[in-house]
Amino acid sequence: MNRCPACGKTYGDEARFCTRDGSKLVVVADKGATRETVAGRAEPPSAVTHANLVGRVLDGRYRIERKVGEGGMSFVYLAKDIASDEQYAIKVLSAALSSDANAMARLRREASLGMRLAHPNVCHIIRLGETPDGLVYVVMPYVEGEVLSDRNNRLGTIPIADVVHYVRDIAAGLHVAHELKIVHRDLKPENVMICAGPSGTERAVVMDFGLAKERRADAELQKLTATGIILGTPEFMSPEQLRGRPLDPRTDVYSLALMTYEMLTGKLPFSGRTQQEMMIARLRSDPMPLRDAMPGLGLEAVERVLQKAMQRDPGDRYQTAPEFATALAAASKVDGEEKSRLGRFFAR
């Protein structure tokens, strides 16, 4: 039998993590149990392989329906609650990550906080569990919609009114996390879902708080991420992230500003032949002005807001995500009024 050292809840021998707070369970010896048998129960399986989980029931509750995505570090499945028929997303971590003690310690710590992220603009963690063959999984609400990166690729650029709306939603979700001392660290378009909101509106939902980060890295950068020097996605990382310095909410503000720039122009504000060159540019160069990336866009006030949000020194940026979102909305209104004024002038 295993027990949570934090809340005292007991579990069977196969469980490793508390479903309430994510704490690692400790083994409680049965009467007559030897030191060897108790120690043996605490050991993870010696050989863990990632088999197809479709059709299996996890935790006696979640039936795996189909695989909906995968990355180098995880597989994502659609699952249904066998009692309520409600849909969930289950992210199953790779065997290598599931057996990595440091990664699991970080995941347990952040999952315990992530379970408290109840907000319409956040896909929060419901529970942390483990399959009988030793694979760690995370249960989340199933959010149906279009990934922001797919939306941007499909449209090329996104209208400023929609961008302001998405940024406001993302900032609201980030702020709740930041109040709990959680920094996303890997905010990017692939981690935002655009789904149906109330009364026919759209809602942006931030995904993957506290989870293992997927990486889009070239060979040079993979050497750094493999050592744990860098945690995040290179294209959207802040300068302090690249330098390996302590992170705070202003890191997510920087990443959100890069996402905003890409939504408006279809481009990133720093260029380079490799991701490493792009990283160096972020440390040494100023971002490309919005007017150069998209001539004729006519968003001078928005450009000034983005320039501030993308400052290399965190102290020179907007200090919170809502502050950035509010400034962006106000700048968009100023630019809209200026366009209307010019339109009336040239119509004379």
Regions found by a protein language model. Name each.
Residues 147-158:
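AlphaC helix of the protein kinase catalytic domain
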Residues 166-167:
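Activation segment signature within eukaryotic-like protein kinase domains
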Residues 94-116:
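AlphaC helix of the eukaryotic protein kinase fold
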